[in-house]
Amino acid sequence: EASELGGLLCFDMYNIRYITSTNIGEWARDKLSRFCLLPRGDEPIMWDFGSAAKHHELYCPWMGGGRSRAGISLLRGAVAPEAGRAEDVARKIKRELEMRGLAKAPLGVDVIELPIYAALQKEGIAGVDGQQLMQAARRIKTPDEIVLLNTAAMMVDAPYEKLYRAMRPGVRENEMVALAAHTLYSMGSEDVEGVNAIAGERCSPHPHIFSDRVLRPGDPAYYDIIHSYMGYRTCYYRSFAVGSASPAMVDAYKRCREYLDVAIAMMKPGITTADIASMWPRAQEFGFPDEEACFGLQYGHGVGLSVWEQPVISRLVSLDHPVTIEAGMVIALETFWPASDGWSAARIEEEVLVTETGHEVITRFPAETLLVAGAPYWTGTGPLNAIRELEPGLGGAGAGAP
């Protein structure tokens, strides 16, 4: 109502879920097949995937009164243009806007296929950016959303416990991904969007994807677990060492944690994203030519129905375009630091709820110091050091307390 828009047309599944409280599964996330219209001053109208429309009419009473309808778009180009689906969608939208006297007002659109956008223009409908309005609406979480985000984070504690116990020489990154995914689906996750499992020399630079690399003694290993419970997501990194940690890795972890803790300590209503980003290191301080080249490594972002929501915190965008932090935001803060050995690195992330008086960290798997996973090794004189160089001649190997 605060905008100039006559309505919002949404194909983004997360926006549709926010507006209509309907969902047909994560398989539909990237299909652009479903669409909804939220007219100014009225209730939403949903055009759903075939029989899903009838299902929602029966079981979603808030979508009653003929507002849950069947309607098919272009399925990201899978339907041939000559079938006329783009024109059909445009006519449907125009008819609803005209009935409410809104056809002359700008229509906010989030994501759309170009043939549908062109068809709307031919019908005289001016499409404008509606994604910013939706992001603004989703920025502050309701109490129910906060409960769901907390529950989703709680669920990730379990795969981290299992990963910690399972990591040892000989297992592969993809096996760790399978373990995390199995654990979450067994607990009721509706979608494990991604498990980044990164080990050894793959840690720096961060590749953002797992492989079948075998874990070896002394490897660093970090994970990001992204999943959805009742629509609400996590972004939750943890770093480990396998069997033992090198002094360089321990130092990198301390540095990574320090940058993260500084950001967490600042989180309260009234500060800005620029305040936080300014406390993080410049790209050149950790081996990158500019902020775009290291985007996402010293990073903050809202978490909700999608894993990246407003506000975004980065030296790339926040210093010149600050956003004020408000109570009710849930923000993931993630930091990275490469080790001096040239291949190890640490990566940690915490999800933070901004409260009226400060903040609450909702990701609870231990991360204040580097955890060493795997069975301890024993020598003839006692336990092998948990902090040791991979090459004994460099010092740090042998028995004794860590």
Can you say where each PLM-predicted feature lies in the sequence?
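Active-site neighborhoods and metal-handling regions in enzymes and metal-associated proteins
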Residues: 1-402
